[in-house]
Amino acid sequence: MEVALPNVPTKMQHPFTKYSEWKFKLFRVKSLERRPSEEETEGSEVSYNSSQETYPKSTVVLEDLSLGSAPQSPTNFKPQQSEKSNVVDNHETDLKRLEEEAHITVIQQLCRICGASFKMDQQNRSYPVHGPVDSETHDILRRREKKVTSWPELISKVFKTDVRADVDTIHPTQFCHNCWTIMNQKFSNISSEVYFPHNQAVEWTPHSANCYVCHSSKPWGKRKSAPQLNPHKMKKRKRGPEFVKKSKTSSGNSIQWKNMKAFNQMKDSCKKIHLDNNLLVLDYPSDFVKSVSCLVCEHILSDPVQTSCKHLFCRICILKYIKLMGCYCPSCKYPCFPTDLTVPVKSYLNVLNALLLKCTVSGCDEEISLGKYSHHISKHKETKGKEVYAHINKGGRPRQHLLTLTRRAQKHRLRELKMQVKAFADKEEEGDVKSVCLTLFLLALRARNEHRQADELEAIMEGRGAGLHPAVCLAIRVNTFLSCSQYHKMYRTVKATTGRQIFQPLHALRNAEKALIPGYHTFEWRPPLKNVSTRTDVGIIDGLSGLNQSLDEYPVDTISKRFRYDAALVSALKDMEEDILEGLKAQDLDDYVSGPFTVVVKESCDGMGDVSEKHGSGPPVPEKAVRFSFTVMNISVPNKNGPVRIFEETKPNSELCCKPLCLMLADESDHETLTAILSPLIAEREAMKTAELLLEMGGILRNFKFSFRGTGYDEKLVREVEGLEASGSLYICTLCDATRLEAAQNLVNHSITRSHCENLQRYEMWRSNPHHESPDELRDRVKGVSAKPFIETLPSIDALHCDIGNAAEFYRIFQLEIGELYKNLSATKEEKKRWQATLDNHIRKRMNLKPIMRMNGNFARKLMSKETVEAVCELVPCEERQAALTELMDLYLKMKPVWRSSCPAKECPELLCQYSFHSQRFAELLSTKFKYRYEGKITNYFHKTLAHVPEIIERDGSIGAWASEGNESGNKLFRRFRKMNARQSKFYEMEDVLKHHWLYTSKYLQKFMNAHNNLKNQGFTVDLDNPDLEQRLESSMESLESMEF
């Protein structure tokens, strides 16, 4: 960098014109007149451009600044006025420009926030004040759900400094790594040794004659300048003592001095409320005394709190210190905020409360432990108060009645009485002040013959008040889909209308729901579960917890919340505790049977499309969701004559028993995301297969074993999790190895051959190709396995999706029969669309069935009926085709109950026996009358319906009971809970939906809700004295039930 001085004499040219990075070589031109500070002292002013004054001749002195000091400001020196005023003006302009450039160069090497030099950091790291935050900070803010994306916003939040209106000539444009670390540490849990060097951010001012940045007397680090080259040319004026320059304290030091003064006053005031460590009875080591003393006031700790750097203070002392001196630890200068303060561990508090102290009351020589010291002192005050207490009215305003006073005045007037009641409660009732006061109130009511209020108070004291049980209120809130705010409004309305607390407040409901959410009950596994924590107080966790860090190469863009599988099963069993104990009694078994109980669990998983919401903050995630749930199907216990079933789910396809386990905003087709979320859950499931659960139930420790059956999957998801090709594959079935052609040629005679273990073996063969076969030969060997299976499913048929798939095929057959495709196999697409429109219009008129874009369960149930076939036959001209179509539907309706019923052996034994005959006749019709459609091909669900139903029922006893219908119904609840009961945030809404859905499936709450509904149906009302209030309460309850939230 070269600097030229135009219009400057040759003798004033600088010998060096290049500047290094750390050293500046500047001219200093000094005049023989006084400095500006001296002129201010003497009360005179001198103007540079004044033509009326005569300036003596100046000399040029070259000064070399030492390393690390700021360049000397040329404003301390005045050039001599020459004979030509324009030359002087040019000199002044050039010097001002040079000093402003030097000022800007200096401030660009300083931090905008704390003013520290970047050279203090060995790596010379700095960050721009204006602009977006860096990637590391952005990730931290994203995890903490902060919307801040730029440095000015973040600096404003952390340091309370607005940098948006900064000017480059006044303010630095960079900040240091120390301030960057403080900002990151504010929003993360990572601690590091960093502290803010000042109590407040530096205030920057424009460059002036007394600029503390450029001037040699800057407040943070003045260094002695190099010796002058020509000291004999400088003339020092003699000055009297009245002109000696007073040392000026900077504004920062003044503020610090005031803060220190306030801090000392605070320490003095602590003597009145805190105990000095000289009161300790024993002669403890000095280090121990320090460990039990506050590091601010140096007294014994009172209400101790611990900072994140593990230092201990009195709560009031550290809060006052932070307010006065800044948010950092007084001991180590580590950043410390009031929200970071925590209570020390209980063992330390026990040691602290056990310290023996001398009583400060004169005449008392007792030695009291610190924990009982306040109680001991209160006894002295009580004794003194009894001696001197007497009501004295010294005139002035008359004493008002107690009930007309404010709460603060009531406390003041009743203070002595409160102390006496507390002393009595501590002595006689183990400190139960509430019971003493309630009993006094009860006796006062009885003495005044106010027995009605006394009865109500007594009922409240005994826990049998007129209000509803908190569990009933919680059941009402969950089953009516009320959010917390809606319930609170209803609670206040009913309380204000009736004057009674019929419903319980929200905090009572939250206490009730804690015992119903997983993570409340303690349990143990033998042997301990592999790779699963032994903690039992685990509630809702992030869906990605337990995921290996090696998966960071694939970004998982999803939000997922789940329960830990074992904790969820424990909570479900405790929720069914009454049912299990009643089952033992019903089977004439002893109540103290310890097991082992065998619990059979049905697992279901399904994807949901289009769950997008207009609201919610957070990262962009797919607008699809996946739900994983389970249902406890039955529980059995071994007996002499074999296992005895003590519990069986009566409605296995109800949404009331299908408990949610995991929710995620993801696409079920995204194999990587699905694997990342469900793999930890599946690992917990595999670990539980070989372990026994020890759980206390009915006061006895009992053993439980679990059997998991993955049957609630549709065909698409089965192929996804078992590593099979998609549903359009050549290999048509997920239960056997038949190809589509083999299934069409032999419609009935097939058996289940696939299994999870075999799919794993075939995947290894597909991956390694040990026989070095061609792709077609290898595919034929592995029978359609193309990915690694990661969830074990039971080879079965999902009854709900079987209905939907078969109904879609019948819907297609109806269209083709209307168009008589058997006559003309080369029909165009326009003709087929016309046939579909004709069918839709006809069944809309006759059956009131509106056409839909995608087949669902309700449409399938209405479509598959005799009425529908009769309506379709009106559009089929040929009577022979009408008879074939009617017979085909009749056979289907005879087969359907076999796979739809929960127990076909009890519900439809005749149809179960005739199933093979009906399936043979159904297959015969397809291969003859409907040969035009099923020659050489067959649909997936027709194949499963005709070939595999008898074998599955023989193995499991039912197909319908193991269907995914409960999980499908849970999908509707997911949408409703997300809309009504969840916070509007992508992170928190999943947690809220999971919690509310779990409470909705609680059998404990369902019993309370059923009992409440029975009482309401029987005409049960609250016994109120005022009939008008009763009518208003009933009308408010009716309006509540009629509300559509």
UniProtKB/Swiss-Prot annotation:
Zn(2+) 2 binds at C294, C297, C314, C317. It comes from the Eukaryota. Zn(2+) 4 binds at C359, C364, H376, H380. Zn(2+) 1 binds at C270, H274, C297, H299. The record marks W899 as: Essential for DNA hairpin formation, participates in base-stacking interactions near the cleavage site. Its cofactor is Mg(2+); Mn(2+). InterPro entries: RAG1, RAG1_imp-bd, RAG1_Znf, RAG_nonamer-bd_dom, Znf_C2H2_sf, Znf_C3HC4_RING-type, Znf_RING, Znf_RING/FYVE/PHD. Its EC number is 3.1.-.-, 2.3.2.27. A zinc finger (RING-type) spans 294-333. Binds 1 divalent metal cation per subunit. Mg(2+) or Mn(2+). Expressed within the thymus, liver and spleen in juvenile frogs, and within the thymus and bone marrow of adults. Its main location: nucleus. Keywords: Chromatin regulator, DNA recombination, DNA-binding, Endonuclease, Hydrolase, Metal-binding, Multifunctional enzyme, Nuclease, Nucleus, Transferase, Ubl conjugation pathway, Zinc, Zinc-finger. A zinc finger (RAG1-type) spans 355-384. It is found in: Nucleus. Catalytic component of the RAG complex, a multiprotein complex that mediates the DNA cleavage phase during V(D)J recombination. V(D)J recombination assembles a diverse repertoire of immunoglobulin and T-cell receptor genes in developing B and T lymphocytes through rearrangement of different V (variable), in some cases D (diversity), and J (joining) gene segments. In the RAG complex, RAG1 mediates the DNA-binding to the conserved recombination signal sequences (RSS) and catalyzes the DNA cleavage activities by introducing a double-strand break between the RSS and the adjacent coding segment. Belongs to the RAG1 family. The RING-type zinc finger mediates the E3 ubiquitin-protein ligase activity. The NBD (nonamer binding) DNA-binding domain mediates the specific binding to the nonamer RSS motif by forming a tightly interwoven homodimer that binds and synapses 2 nonamer elements, with each NBD making contact with both DNA molecules. Each RSS is composed of well-conserved heptamer (consensus 5'-CACAGTG-3') and nonamer (consensus 5'-ACAAAAACC-3') sequences separated by a spacer of either 12 bp or 23 bp. This is V(D)J recombination-activating protein 1. It comes from Xenopus laevis (African clawed frog). The gene is rag1.
